[in-house]
Amino acid sequence: MTFVLISIMIYARKVGDNMSDSIFEKFEYITPEIARENGISKFKFYKYICDNHLEQVSHGVYTAPNQWVDELYLLHRRCPKAIFSHDEAFYYHGLTDREPIKHTLTIYSGYNAHRLTADGSCKIYTIKKELLDVGKTMVTDYSGNSIPIYNLERTVCDLVRSRNSIEIQEFNSVLKAYIARKDKNLNVLMEYAAMFRVQNILRRYMEVLL
């Protein structure tokens, strides 16, 4: 289902000091960081928010009134380094038809994810910093926004790494769904598995299913 999001068009205005006639890019969501990157002062940013009655949909993120909220994209904006994984990746890649109860993301060990977990809507997994970007890919979500998510092979490695916290029925179902995929890449899968030290365990499962 395609959601047509109302874009926010911000034009530079003269507020207090002399502002150039530059035009801000179109944004579905606007943040102080986006404004700052475009040379807009904090004062002008918040004046625009106030004058146009924009709604705060997350910490530091604003959008047009009554705008449909793309939760995945908002999470990405709140924590750009985090990558959607596990349940979220199972569902996105079509390895399960069970929509995630919570958004699942992976971030490097030591990152303070309290802001993401405080409301109970997210489950966070951690990994060594040097392994965080292995298998990372940018995809278009269901609302047309670009978000980071792990590819199929990294997703299967995460499945095996987290097998003790995943229901056995779901584990088997996801793994079988991957095996049935025509676009699977077993060479890449085993390369990743070696990096995450799950190659022996994964090989045993694969020998049974292949």
Predicted features by range, described:
Residues 2-17:
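Short, positively charged and aromatic/hydrophobic N-terminal segments
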Residues 38-49:
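Short amphipathic alpha-helical interaction segments
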Residues 19-23:
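Short helix->loop/beta-hairpin flanking segments within DNA-binding domains
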Residues 24-34, 49, 61-210:
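Nucleic-acid-binding surface
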Residues 53-58:
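A short, conserved structural fragment
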